[in-house]
């Protein structure tokens, strides 16, 4: 159906005392992203004209963490209830738009459920998201007459009979802006908590003869809030289980779905295999037939077809062409680039460095600010000395170069095509094409040498 323009209000003023943290509750992360950011993203995906964020505790931290240009910051200086929070945002409501109310500590609400709620909202009435619980203790109960919603009674204000009701309020609702402002102005704090409840607008709407339509989410986890770290950890596992299931159904082989974390977006080809305890962060692309070993962390990187990443390797902001092999225990830092068939072995670190086609750095090596050609062998213990304490400098190594073990290349320096660097050499000047560079101290030998003996 055709929807009205819509703005979203996100309540995020709570302190989160039970988190036992200096960080505002809504900034605690789920799947690598602040809880409230999940809600903001859902609002934006839904096409919100404006997102009003009602904040209180930790406002400076919130503003530092959330840089969404679409946010309108609304201060709730005193936390006097959900109705009071909405009253602070009400001056920003347009009369002819719908207002959707969400919560910064309910991170798994889906766009599909919110669109269903939006579509179900009757003209001039309220769309309400509700669920039925076997044990509704502590939640506001939905009251009905002849099947029609008449109001919401908070648990502390409910009678014994009302407490038997299993349908509860999730707190998520949508109504017209003009109606919302009128109802908010009529709220009182005449209740056990002495607070202004947004839920009281349901009874006000019913008294005006307005229709209230209740819809249910696809999954209960969508409307579960977070008040402590235990609840947050449970929602994290729910989320990760859902992501793992989607990947498995899409053809990705997860060796143990319970030991896989997706903290971003994963784009993948066919026949991808991911072993246990792998973490994917940010935006990651895996080509066809990629294999990732146990304990790896891949962040904001592109991995080409037929690449194999061995266990306990960290890849961040890197690009790998096809058929590269990495690890185990390798680290590719931002700006690392491997061309087709390149190999980076155990205990090799790269940063802002390119390794050419078929080139190899087998072990115990640091390559920083370096451009390395094709078919180059980098021996064990090689270091590009790129930093003088103030500035970074570049090392350039041409095609078909052989770099012996325990070599130091003091940048800026260039090694020409086909050159050979003898083991143990410290390169401080450019090396010509097809030349041999050697800087070792001449070996001496003392015949009949005896090691010192400790005196007894």
From Swiss-Prot:
This is Bifunctional protein GlmU. Binds 1 Mg(2+) ion per subunit. Mg(2+) binds at residues 105, 227. It comes from Escherichia coli O6:K15:H31 (strain 536 / UPEC). One of its GO terms (molecular function) is UDP-N-acetylglucosamine diphosphorylase activity. The active site is at residue 363. Pfam families: Hexapep (PF00132), NTP_transf_3 (PF12804). Catalyzes the last two sequential reactions in the de novo biosynthetic pathway for UDP-N-acetylglucosamine (UDP-GlcNAc). The C-terminal domain catalyzes the transfer of acetyl group from acetyl coenzyme A to glucosamine-1-phosphate (GlcN-1-P) to produce N-acetylglucosamine-1-phosphate (GlcNAc-1-P), which is converted into UDP-GlcNAc by the transfer of uridine 5-monophosphate (from uridine 5-triphosphate), a reaction catalyzed by the N-terminal domain. Its cofactor is Mg(2+). The keyword Transmembrane does not apply. GO terms for cellular component: cytoplasm; membrane. Homotrimer. GO terms for biological process: cell morphogenesis; cell wall organization; lipid A biosynthetic process; peptidoglycan biosynthetic process; regulation of cell shape; UDP-N-acetylglucosamine biosynthetic process. It comes from the Bacteria. Residues 230-250 are annotated as: Linker. The keyword Cell wall biogenesis/degradation applies. Its main location: cytoplasm. Residues 251-456 are annotated as: N-acetyltransferase. UDP-N-acetyl-alpha-D-glucosamine binds at residues 11-14, 25, 76, 81-82, 103-105, 140, 154, 169, 227, 333, 351, 366, 377. InterPro entries: Bifunctional_GlmU, GlmU-like, GlmU_C_LbH, Hexapep, Hexapep_transf_CS, MobA-like_NTP_Trfase, Nucleotide-diphossugar_trans, Trimer_LpxA-like_sf.
